[in-house]
Every structure is written in C-alpha cells, then in structure tokens.
Amino acid sequence: MNIHEYQAKAVLREFGVSVSKGVPILKASDAEAAAKQLGGPVWVVKSQIHAGGRGKGKFKEASAGDKGGVRLAKSIDEVKQFVDQMLGKTLVTVQTGPAGKQVNRLYLEEGADIDKEFYLSALVDRETSRIAFVVSTEGGMDIEKVAHDTPEKIVTFSVDPATGIMPHHGRKVAQALKLKGDQAKQAEKLVNQLYTAFIAKDMSMLEINPLILSKQGELRCLDAKISFDSNAIYRHPDVMELRDETEEDAKEIEASKYDLAYIALDGTIGCMVNGAGLAMATLDIIKLYGESPANFLDVGGGASEEKVTAAFKIITADPNVKGILVNIFGGIMKCDVIAAGVVAAVKAVGLKVPLVVRLEGTNVEEGKKIIRESGLNVLPADDLDDAAQKIVKAVKGK
C-alpha cells in the first residue's frame, strides 16, 4: 500500500526524523491560510499523487500552465495562483502513463536552503531476505538512471536481522555521502530512525530523494515515499486510515475485497488464471501471438464459485477488454467450480466479447460438461498454446 508524501513525512516525524514543515491543501480556498501558517518567504507547491517524476511532469490542461507538478512560489499570491492552476488537474509523469493522474491534493511546504542533495532508501532485499539500504551522492535524480550510467556512485548494504541496525551502518552511510563531524553523526542517527520506522510499520520500501544537507549544516528529508507490506496492514489500523482509494484502480480495490490478486494492464485480452506462475506464462503467450493482456488475475488455489464470479465481473468491467481467456490447471482448484463460476458470471453480466476456456486437472470433465451444457458461446481449448491462438484470432476477428 502506498501513501502520499505528506503522509509519509508525518509517519517519519513520529520517529524523530527531520522533515520540512508543510500543510496539505485539499481545496483552493485553504491556500492563503496555509502559506501564512508556514511564513515564507519561499514556498514549494507539490502535487500529491502516487507516482514519481512529479517535478518533471506536465499537466494535460492548458489552464494549469506549462510548469511541472512541483513549483516554487515566492509570494502568497503566487502560492494561490499555483494552487488554483494545479488542483483538480491531470498530471502526466513517466510513471503515470499517458492517461496521467488527477491531482486532488497538494502539499505546501516551506522552502529550503540546499547545499547538497543525496539519495537514501531502505527496502526489502529478496535475495538476502534482509532490509537493505541504498545510498548515493546523486540525490534528486532518477536512481535507476544513476544505477545505469554511474553505478559506482551507489553504495548498498543489508542489515542482519539478528543484530538489527548497528553504529557501523550509520558510519557507512556517512562515509558514502562524504559527511564528517556533526553531519556524520546526524547521518548515523537518521539511519537508526529510518530502520526503526521501517520495522515498526512493516514497510516494504522507504525512499528519501532527495535527502538534503542545508546551508545551515542540517540533514533533512526533502521528499519521502513509503510503501507498506499489504500482508501486514491488518496490524496497523493507523496506516490503513492513510489509504487513498482515489489513487488506486477501482477494479483492483474490488478485487482486494475477494482476496483476488489483480493488476490492471493496458492490453485488450482479459485473463483469469489460477496460480501466479501460470498467470505469468499466460500473459507471455498472449504477447507471443501478437496481442496484449488487459490484466493479471490469479484466483488462487481455493477459489469458490462466488470468487470466480467476482473475478469475471471485474474483468468485464474493463472497457478495453475485447476478449477473455480463462486458463485453469486444476489441483486444489477444481475445474467444475471454475466452470460453474464462469457460467454464473456470464449469465449475470452477459457476454459481449469472445471467451476462450482452457481447463485441465481435477474434475476437468465435469467442468467441460458444465460449460458445454450451459448453452453459452464459449470456445474450448485443449492446451495453453491452443487457447492463446484462439483468443488472439477471435479478438482480431479472424
């Protein structure tokens, strides 16, 4: 689960992390009061969306002006102007795709006298099963580009969970950032605070980009991005309250209610599969035959008829779907249950696009019989290759 920058900074404040003062703005009429509260003389108006690249992004609407999603204001009037221009407009960044995201919230923050910018993040390293830190002197930039162009400028290390964070980890960060004296001590303290927050809140990623050194010699988090482990959210009702469903795909929200693993994609063929590995293979073979999947959807091993029906309804709710491929290998998941769910869903929502069903495994004959006797216009497939070719041909009208 992702949260907004201003929410991430509020979480970090709980652990004593130094962050800039700011005020969230939900409506334009709040702009002047927020600016006066911070005092100025310089303010930063930041778009709050769940995507990176906001500063270099562009708004779709001409009325939003030609500046990006992060703007520097030097007067209260300019703050009000930017808020009016940005709030409610659609921001397109490298991470939003061409559709962009509507900016429903802004964050007004005090300006900062920046001497240096750094990069610092913590994440779950799946190779070592540990929390790893990524550090670089190249702050304020796309870290993927830094890793590609100048990998020697990135330092990484992991923390042994048996010992937890140790003083030498903080010293390693200070050394990587070329900090000495009091600034090095600040870095050591910050690393300890970030690790503590990461563990306490069950985060999966914590990114500070940039971490700045002010001209007054203070280390401060100028931006913050936090992702939480969705499997651990139940332990943190306070974190759940931070969820902004307007930033999430409506279909993904609906899928989460039924414990379905659903990810919206930008293709035309809807997929319903059991098992993540088989689902990935299904997406690949659709691409192989010249089309693109509209979603990743794993119904899991113990899906009920109700769950299958919900999955089918979610797929058909996508207006981009021109065809549907159901690919089930029944083990724990029984083919007759899938078949009954598909039939029930089709009868409930109607079938306006081609549907190919491939069933194999437990109760496969019963499943095929249910579909065959349903009277529905369903194309049966013998194997995955056959299924992919049939749905691609059907979508292309061949």
Swiss-Prot record:
The keyword Ligase applies. It comes from the Bacteria. Substrate binds at N274, G331, I332, M333. Binds 1 Mg(2+) ion per subunit. This is Succinate--CoA ligase [ADP-forming] subunit beta. NCBIfam families: PRK00696.1, sucCoAbeta. HAMAP family: Succ_CoA_beta. The keyword Isomerase does not apply. Mg(2+) binds at N209, D223. One of its GO terms (cellular component) is succinate-CoA ligase complex. Keywords: ATP-binding, Ligase, Magnesium, Metal-binding, Nucleotide-binding, Tricarboxylic acid cycle. Its cofactor is Mg(2+). Belongs to the succinate/malate CoA ligase beta subunit family. Gene3D superfamilies: ATP-grasp fold, A domain (3.30.1490.20), ATP-grasp fold, B domain (3.30.470.20), Succinyl-CoA synthetase domains (3.40.50.261). Pfam families: ATP-grasp_2 (PF08442), Ligase_CoA (PF00549). Succinyl-CoA synthetase functions in the citric acid cycle (TCA), coupling the hydrolysis of succinyl-CoA to the synthesis of either ATP or GTP and thus represents the only step of substrate-level phosphorylation in the TCA. The beta subunit provides nucleotide specificity of the enzyme and binds the substrate succinate, while the binding sites for coenzyme A and phosphate are found in the alpha subunit.
